[in-house]
């Protein structure tokens, strides 16, 4: 006797929930990396479903670079109160002492110090042996190589040639001494799946994803939002109010906006169906040849 036929989104949801439950059962000290973006919002929703009516049995960790959009930090703090999850926030103290910023030090150095090293510091500090992340295989070519259980060595480095097979959705959680894993429950989701699921489940997301008039300047073909007074303007540069939104969120000086009139979820989904460009086209760090995504991941990046 066959069971009920699940829709595409229901199949993805069931797979992700299974991964959450399996890791929670197998590992001693898991954590969920919370970057506050749309994928993190879906990940949080799935984690709440996986353990309902109980509380999520692990904390959420935000590695704060000190350069996130103000609306992201506001959303993070409100979400922690609304959903009652344990929130850990870590900032690299050495980076803060250096006055690390993407303007003086460059995007690659800033990302390495405040994101990669900051993450490794937090993982070591709390002794986490498994870290959930919201990466998807459709985002970028190095992420397409990643397993659901992504093994990292004692220095949190990723070796794409030294990973475990995952046949028939069977995951090998046996880690060697000093190893840990990053876990990606959204591996098989696409950007369109994410937006359709957000619409279906009525998931809260940062308002920056919706079009609004915002102060931006254009640099090297990228629209950068001037989010606070710390952003140095070039000679003759004047922020212009444009109707824009963001497809991806990160440090505000390193995240490009797109011109858009999509003020609703249905509007965003309609844009998605017509889009022929990557959501990460607005990430300045992805265009830094000295800081490719695969190189960052090998060094311990998300």
UniProtKB/Swiss-Prot annotation:
It is an enzyme of class 2 (transferase). Its EC number is 2.7.7.4. With CysN forms the ATP sulfurylase (ATPS) that catalyzes the adenylation of sulfate producing adenosine 5'-phosphosulfate (APS) and diphosphate, the first enzymatic step in sulfur assimilation pathway. APS synthesis involves the formation of a high-energy phosphoric-sulfuric acid anhydride bond driven by GTP hydrolysis by CysN coupled to ATP hydrolysis by CysD. Residues 280-302 are annotated as: Disordered. SUPFAM superfamilies: Adenine nucleotide alpha hydrolases-like. Pathway: Sulfur metabolism; hydrogen sulfide biosynthesis; sulfite from sulfate: step 1/3. InterPro entries: PAPS_reduct_dom, Rossmann-like_a/b/a_fold, SO4_adenylTrfase_ssu, Sulfate_adenylyltrnsfr_sub2. Belongs to the PAPS reductase family. CysD subfamily. Heterodimer composed of CysD, the smaller subunit, and CysN. The lineage of its organism: Bacteria, Pseudomonadati, Pseudomonadota, Gammaproteobacteria, Alteromonadales. One of its GO terms (molecular function) is sulfate adenylyltransferase (ATP) activity. It catalyses: sulfate + ATP + H(+) = adenosine 5'-phosphosulfate + diphosphate. Keywords: ATP-binding, Nucleotide-binding, Nucleotidyltransferase, Transferase. GO terms for biological process: hydrogen sulfide biosynthetic process; sulfate assimilation. It comes from Shewanella amazonensis (strain ATCC BAA-1098 / SB2B). This is Sulfate adenylyltransferase subunit 2. Pfam families: PAPS_reduct.
